[in-house]
Amino acid sequence: LRAWAERFRPWSVWAPWRAEQHCDHVAANGLASDFVSATPERALVKMEYLVWGWADPDLAHHHGAKGIWGLMCGDEIQRRRQALACHRTQMSSVIDDAAEAFLIPPDLAALTDRPVEIFLECRR
């Protein structure tokens, strides 16, 4: 990752929101945080996106963002729907023997129909 960053010199690193409830999202955020911390010579910005975090009723009080960015993506709605549909284990009852199923509720899935995606800029 470091060699890639030295070659492409990104201004930012993007990861799922640090308070997401799924271990793979938390791990991805941890990797991004470690990378930003390990490159103090560059002023990298960590941007976080919400997946399950939208279901958090107290999101506005504890998201911890330095800034909130919106990216217009109305022309990508169909692709976003298709991408969400690829997550079969979260969109249907494919997994029926888990103690805690994690099906995406319809109101959360409907967020892919928004013409804007929201990103949280992390505090350093």
What are these regions (language model features)?
Residues 1-124:
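Metal-dependent de-N-acetylase/amidase catalytic core
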